[in-house]
Regions:
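Short cysteine-rich clusters marking metal-coordination/redox-active sites
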Residues: 187, 401, 472, 515-518, ...
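Cys/His-coordinated zinc-binding microdomains
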Residues: 191, 460, 476, 519, ...
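Protease-associated
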Residues: 247, 254-327, 336-340
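Residue patterns forming the tRNA-binding/recognition surfaces of aminoacyl-tRNA synthetases
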Residues: 2-20, 26, 30-34, 106-243, ...
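Acidic, turn-prone loop/beta-hairpin segments
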Residues: 95, 184, 188, 194-200, ...
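Alpha-helical recognition segments enriched in aromatics with Gly/Pro capping
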Residues: 312, 345-357, 461-463, 486-636
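N-terminal catalytic cores of NTP/NDP-binding nucleotidyl/phosphoryl-transfer enzymes
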Residues: 42-103, 164, 234-242, 314-341, ...
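Residues immediately within or flanking Cys/His clusters that coordinate Zn2+
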Residues: 184, 398, 467-469, 512, ...
Length: 922
């Protein structure tokens, strides 16, 4: 007889090879036919709400690994909440306006954008943005992200624009928006103001200079000193700003020394910095003639080093003694502190640089030069004039534009601002009501809000939402009222914001409208600037989430670390400043950057980038999801081909675990689970270990520690199942009677394990777990259409073993490990071949004496040997010898009982009984 046919051999239609690149698109089609997103909402309708508000990516390019990490984490969160009984609407969004789109379309199409009409340019931008929305959407769908992809929000949609106009109007009405001449970050290349979040710092070489400003008027306070030899020494790293100097700032309470050099010249500088500065000037000998507090010099005048004007001595508390000379070069057109200080002293604003970064006529001979071109010329002029005290070549961190990557300048221009100071305390207080992950996020955002100046919200661009303000041609004052806001919002709702550029001001305003300031109706002009893109995205919680979905605040925001300065902050400021509410999110979670395998930023120039589309085609989306779900995203997340190859091995361990369960559950009815009292203790041990895994996974999902979920499931598959439990139960599964209690006991454990693991891992391994779910048997209460329609299971407490029993199994595992080591050595010594050819003698210490009382056949099965003897001694020892008896032709155990059942000379009694119970086998 061919006894192989009498075995319960593993069989299922679940393939060992994943073939994810081919299989996943089939699953996507299945989900589309199922209408997965809407069916999920129907399934959980009426349950507690979990709302993750999507931070909108720019629609200006294909997916990159940062996009993939972000959307994967969002999908993990939404799926895990859905499977824990929450209603999880998720509307994806895109940020469409601003420089990223303009720069991309100009670069791609090589357009002379200044020669295009506004309508032509905006139409091109709109088409470009729409194209990349489609590109990115298809990439996110390929990842398996569950969302309302047919109804995303877009910041360029007319409805969104209309609502954003109302946000602006409310913030204006609240007194938080004004127009003023103040220094802002300015990009000369793109000719626009920039927000702080649009600045990147790079290390640049630079010439730093120490410059002499000769004393001009000492107010009669220093009659004993020769004024012709007395100078204040300032220090700067931006030579080009010197033509704009109007003042020198000193700290009122610090001591300032008059220092006499061997050449007879005298220099005024902070006493605390004298040794350092004089050393830089090449003086190892000098004399401190006298000292005075900074306040002593207030309102004195110094002569400009190379222009025919004076510089006033002013006081400022921000002057520090950690660098420079303690005498701070002050140019109100180029610095926020400088501006405020000069404003306090009633000095006029001077901005000697134009939109393109060229000096104006105010700068004299340097007029027409770009700022970077003027640096060496000014330096040479100061050398020739004898006004250069010293210079040094250094490398310093300097701000650059995030789009064009070129250096920016700080320049005073007329701009629209949001006065953050007026509601800063409320914004900071709102942070207290938020759960921050990680916890230090609260302090980071609080400190940024605390330190920030007023928010420059205007941009000199054409592709953006127009600032909805009119100007009266008669009195010149700006107009923004409830009436005008209602008119513009209604117009944009119907025609979009292009109407602003296509219609005359009078045609947009209500009939008979008059200026609220002067009462005239002679005519009106439109504001030409557009809103900062951060105002767009900062308004999404109102313009998209609340108005479209009907809830506020969001349960969660999750974005990269840079969004403390960007979207998190702009959303908070809009919520507090415009709506008068708290934070627009209850929880705020952040993740790190994606970097290459060596921890470097990924750049085209380095050739170290990874394309999500290539990963889909080579490994499958589930491997990309596993990468995101196995990484500690609180720090920078590394990605490389080697990392994905290693993840493939981890993936196969889980897949093979699932396949083992599925193969051995063929024909099993989950409605007929074996009761705990009837299960073998080993099977209850496996379920008890599963219970521990369930608790760890639930805790990890609650903490958004997805890497802990992945690692815990991987460890369970490798350590508890593959290396221990599965090996032991194979004999029972294959050789015991198909419907025997012993086999059904093991199948019950396998079902509970597979069912729980598939549900727990489904938020991360979405495609594979769905494939498993569709292949496995189910209970009648389950929704067999999708694993996502089912809740994660709670621990099976009825099956749990008590703690003392689990301790006993830990000792059994330790003994088994020692036996395995001895078996390996015996195989190496050619004493035995397979472990079933062995007989082992085990000596155990007194604390393991319970092993001597165990049924010998049961213990032999646990150790996967044919025979075992246990004695109690001083320490654990194992001796291996060939088993005595005959090899069973069916189960391959070597036993003395083989052939003792009549008619079955080559079988052991167990196998003989099983074969006798079967129908006749040919």
């Amino acid at each position: 007889m061919e006894y192989k046919k009498t075995l319960n051999m593993p069989k299922s239609g679940f393939p060992m090879r994943a073939g994810l690149p081919k299989r996943e698109p089939e699953m996507l089609r299945y989900w589309e036919q199922l209408d997965l997103y809407n069916e999920l909402l129907k399934k959980n309708e009426g349950k507690p709400l979990f709302s993750l508000h999507d931070g909108p990516p720019f629609s200006n390019g294909a997916l990159h690994m940062g996009h993939a990490l972000n959307k994967a984490l969002k999908d993990f969160i939404n799926r895990s909440y859905a499977m824990r009984g929450y209603y999880t609407p998720y509307i994806p969004g895109w940020d469409n306006h601003g420089m990223p789109i303009e720069s991309a379309i100009i670069k791609q199409n090589k357009l002379n954008h200044k020669a295009m009409s506004v309508a032509e340019f905006r139409s091109a931008c709109h088409q470009f943005a729409d194209h990349y929305i489609d590109v990115q959407r298809e990439g996110f769908k390929r990842m398996g992200v569950v969302a309302d992809w047919d109804h995303p929000y877009k910041t360029m949609d007319p409805g969104f624009e209309a609502r954003e106009v109302r946000v602006f109007g409310q913030m204006y009405k609240n007194g938080h928006i004004y127009k003023g001449l103040k220094p802002v970050y300015w990009c000369p290349h793109d000719e626009t103001a920039l927000a702080e979040a649009e600045i990147e710092y790079q290390d640049d070489p630079c010439t730093t200079v120490y410059v002499k400003f000769p004393m001009n008027d000492d107010l009669g306070k220093l009659p004993h000193l020769d004024k012709s030899k007395l100078s204040f020494v300032i220090w700067t790293t931006t030579i080009w700003t010197l033509p704009g100097n109007l003042a020198i700032a000193l700290h009122p309470d610090e001591s300032y020394a008059v220092v006499k050099a061997p050449n007879g010249e005298m220099y005024i500088m902070a006493e605390a910095l004298t040794e350092k500065v004089m050393g830089i000037g090449g003086f190892d000998r000098y004399e401190i003639v006298e000292t005075h507090p900074g306040s002593f010099y207030e309102n004195m005048l110094a002569s400009h080093p190379f222009l025919p004007k004076t510089s006033r001595l002013v006081l400022a508390d921000y002057v520090t003694m950690d660098s420079g000379t303690g005498c701070v070069h002050t140019a109100p057109g180029f610095g926020a502190d400088d501006y405020q200080t000069c404003l306090r002293y009633g000095m006029d604003m001077v901005v000697p640089v134009d939109d393109q970064g060229r000096h104006t006529d105010y700068a004299g001979k340097y007029a027409g030069m770009k700022t970077e071109e003027s640096n060496p010329v000014i330096l040479q002029d100061m050398k020739e004039a004898g006004s250069l005290f010293a210079s040094q070549e250094i490398v310093h961190s300097y701000p650059h534009c995030w789009r064009c990557k070129k250096p920016i300048i700080f320049r005073a221009t007329p701009q629209w601002f949001c006065s953050v100071e007026s509601f800063k305390d409320d914004a900071i207080a709102a942070c207290e009501d938020v759960r921050w992950v990680p916890s230090w996020g609260k302090d980071r955002l609080r400190s940024m809000v605390l330190e920030r100046t007023d928010w420059c919200i205007s941009r000199q661009r054409r592709w953006g939402l127009p600032i909805p303000v009119f100007y009266c041609k008669d009195c010149g004052k700006p107009i923004c009222t409830d009436e005008t806001i209602d008119a513009i919002a209604g117009l944009f709702e119907k025609k979009g914001s292009n109407a602003w550029f296509e219609m005359e001001a009078e045609d947009m305003l209500p009939e008979g409208f008059t200026c609220p300031h002067c009462g005239k109706s002679a005519g009106f002009e439109k504001e030409s600037d557009t809103l900062d893109g951060w105002f767009d995205s900062g308004s999404t919680h109102y313009a998209a989430m609340e108005r479209d979905q009907g809830f506020w605040p969001a349960t969660m925001y999750i974005e990269g670390l840079d969004q403390y300065r960007g979207w998190f902050q702009s959303s908070l400021l809009v919520a507090v400043g415009a709506l008068g509410r708290g934070a627009p999110f209850k929880e705020c979670l952040t993740h790190g950057w994606t970097v290459d395998g060596q921890g470097r930023a990924m750049h085209k120039s380095l050739g170290n980038g990874m394309d999500p589309a290539e990963i889909f085609n080579k490994y499958g989306a589930d491997l990309l999801r596993l990468w995101a779900g196995s990484s500690d995203y609180h720090v920078d997340v590394r990605c490389s081909d080697d990392i994905f190859k290693q993840l493939s091995q981890n993936y196969l361990k889980f897949r093979n675990t699932a396949k083992f369960c599925l193969d051995n559950l063929t024909g099993f009815d989950p409605e007929q689970l074996v009761a705990a009292a009837d299960m073998q203790e080993l099977d209850r041990w496996a379920v008890t270990r599963l219970n521990s895994l369930i608790r760890r996974v639930f805790d990890s999902y609650d903490a958004y520690e997805f890497h802990a979920v992945s690692h815990a499931i991987n460890d369970f598959c490798v350590v508890d199942l593959s290396s221990f439990y599965f090996d032991i139960i194979k004999d029972r599964l294959y050789c015991d009677g198909e419907n025997s209690l012993s086999r059904r006991s093991a199948q019950t454990a396998l079902f509970l394990i597979l069912d729980a693991m598939t549900r727990m891992f489904a938020p991360i391994l979405a495609f594979t777990c769905e494939e498993i779910w569709l292949a496995m048997p189910h209970r009648s209460a389950d929704d067999s259409r999708s694993v996502l329609f089912n809740c994660m299971v709670q621990p099976y407490e009825d099956y749990a073993l008590p703690e003392d029993a689990m301790d006993r199994w830990a000792r059994i595992a330790a003994v088994r490990s020692a036996v395995n080591g001895a078996l390996e050595q015996a195989r190496a010594d050619k004493t035995i071949g397979k472990s079933l050819e062995a007989e082992v003698d085990v000596t155990v210490p007194a604390e393991d004496a319970f092993l001597a009382d165990m049924d010998a056949d049961t213990l032999a099965d646990l150790l996967i040997v044919s025979q075992v003897r246990v004695t109690v001694g001083d320490a654990l020892t194992v001796t291996v010898a060939p088993a005595q008896g005959v090899k069973c032709a069916r189960c391959w155990k070597v036993l003395t009982s083989v052939g003792t059942v009549a008619g079955h000379d080559t079988l052991c009694p167990r196998c003989a009984a099983v074969v006798k119970s079967l129908p006749v086998v040919e």
